[in-house]
Amino acid sequence: MARSIKKGPFVDEKLFDKVQKAVASGNKSVIKTWSRRSTITPDLIGHTFAVHNGKKFIPVFVTENMVGHKLGEFAPTRIFFSHAGDRKSKVRK
């Protein structure tokens, strides 16, 4: 079920404070965050976030197309190693 419109989008307070400080100082450095659950709002456009994927931080540059999505959507947590090929048929031929 979607979040109520009356509540508004969720953005972690600490993350929002970091963005406000960056805007006030004019600093465009990477903002490190563990808050994958935060919704991207128009205030975050143009900033680069280092989003934690459980192992390392993935740089995510926020654009207009990302508004309404979550930060965690752009930092995948799982790596897909392709399924093992059919080695027996290659060896027999």
Swiss-Prot record:
HAMAP family with a match to the protein in the record: Ribosomal_uS19
One term of GO molecular function: structural constituent of ribosome
UniProt-listed GO biological process terms: ribosomal small subunit assembly; translation
Stated family: Belongs to the universal ribosomal protein uS19 family.
UniProt-listed InterPro entries: Ribosomal_uS19 (IPR002222), Ribosomal_uS19_bac-type (IPR005732), Ribosomal_uS19_CS (IPR020934), Ribosomal_uS19_SF (IPR023575)
Pfam family, one: Ribosomal_S19
Taxonomic lineage of the native organism: Bacteria, Pseudomonadati, Thermodesulfobacteriota, Syntrophia, Syntrophales
Keywords: Ribonucleoprotein, Ribosomal protein, RNA-binding, rRNA-binding
Entry GO CC: cytoplasm; small ribosomal subunit
Known role: Protein S19 forms a complex with S13 that binds strongly to the 16S ribosomal RNA.
Organism domain of life: Bacteria
Protein name (database record): Small ribosomal subunit protein uS19
Signal peptide span: none
